[in-house]
């Protein structure tokens, strides 16, 4: 059975904080780690710990600076491709949950590396490093609402490739590749939320595909993009 355990009691994260240590304290309060656990951490606390915050009066200028390319724009609404290759609103730049009024939060420079540092820190503390996902909220074309997705991954493969396997009726699967890291991020978001003050959660009971994958594997290759 899969369960999702919120990690509570984390203080307001500041630039330079040892995020792995803060998360480790929260893990202790939640009863520790088990083999196979997946830790999902909200991007905002990762960015704050890494100093990816700044004061600005010009949000659009910050968005354009963080963007590799602008895909669509309508007034102040900008859908942009980030330097990482993610396509999202505002290039991931956000005022919500910023340290103070007039400040913004940027995406981590390398979310995979951020996840790996957390995994290493927890591994040193607990003797086992859980798979780690750094998550952020993305909108989806042609669908209302947002859902959390993985922008950084360590200690697991983000995709589960079922091509070549057979379904319950014996048909061979020809195109089924499941974005398990995104699904785990979405599951964790149910107990984290944007206003609950819970920036991390453990997903327990799911056998994540082992390996050293990257969240960039979740980005659609340009040659397969039908909506460039």
What are these regions (language model features)?
Residues 13, 17-21, 108-112, 116, ...:
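Electropositive phosphate-/nucleotide-binding environments in soluble metabolic enzymes
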Residues 3-10, 43-48, 53-99, 126-228:
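A structural signal for small-residue-enriched, beta-sheet-centric alpha/beta enzyme cores
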